[in-house]
Amino acid sequence: MLKAIILAAGKGTRMKSDKPKVVHEVLGKPMVYYSIEAAKNAGCEKVCVIVGYKAEEVEHSIHATYESLGLADEMNNRVSYALQKEQLGTGHAVKCASDFIGNDGDVVVLCGDTPLVTADTLESAIRRHKTDGNGVTVISAMLDDPFGYGRIIRDDKGLDRIVEQKDATEEEQAVCEVNSGMYIFQCDALLSALSQVKNDNAQGEYYLPDTIGIILSLIHISEPTRHLRI
C-alpha cells in the first residue's frame, strides 16, 4: 500500500500569525488541503497528517473544507492524525506516526505548506522510486538563492547527504541544489533509520533528512529527482 504523511505540526513563525501556517488559505482552502489532495491523486490510499501547534484548529480546518465539498465521509476514511506534542524536528514528527507507517509498502512524506505541489510531480517521483527499487527517493530543486534550504551534498558516487542551512559549512552553503522536503521511503527502511537519528546539531532537533545518509549506508538510493519546492 502507498501511504502519505503530511507534516503540519509547526507554528510557522515567519507568517507572523497566531494561526497555524498550514491553515492559511490559498484560493479559499487551507494550504494543507492541497498537499492532501496531491497525495491522494498520486495514488496514496491513506494519509496521516502530523499535527502539533493548535492541533484541533488544523483538524477542524481540514474537516470543514472536505465537509463543504460534500466529501466528509471520504476524508474520514482516508485521513487520520498523529500528534507531535513537542516540536522536536521533522524526524521526530514522522516518528510520531510510526504505527501508521508500518513495515510494508512505501510512504510519501510532504510538507503541509506546499499548495502548488502536483500529483504529476509526485507520480513521477513514485515511479522512479519503484522502478529503481530505492530505499528512499528525494525530490530536489536548483535555486539561484538557496538560503534557508537544506543542501543536497554529492560526492563522486552521487548523493552523499543533506545538510541543513544552520549546520552547513561555507562551502556547503554555496551549493544551489536544495532539498524540497518531499520524499518517498520504503516503510521498513524509514522506521529503521528514524531509530538511529540523533539531535546533535545546531537546532538540537531530530532532522528527517538525516535518515537519508543512514539509508544510503544500507541500501540503494537514486539520484535526487529535481523539483522546485513552493
Language-model features and meaning:
Residues M1-S17:
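N-terminal nucleotide-binding beta1-loop-alpha1 segment
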Residues A4-I6, V49, V109, V136-I139:
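Structural beta-sheet core signal
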Residues R14, P115-L116:
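A short, conserved beta-strand element in the Rossmann-like catalytic core
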Residues K19-E25, V197-D200:
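Short glycine-enriched, charge-decorated loop/helix-capping segments at active-site entrances
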Residues P30-L110, L116-T121, R127, T131:
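Conserved N-terminal catalytic core of the sugar/cofactor nucleotidyltransferase
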Residues V117-A202:
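Conserved core of the sugar-phosphate nucleotidyltransferase
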Residues G204-S217:
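A short, conserved alpha-helix in the catalytic core of glycosyltransferases
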Residues I219-I230:
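Single conserved hydrophobic/aromatic residue that forms the stacking wall/gate
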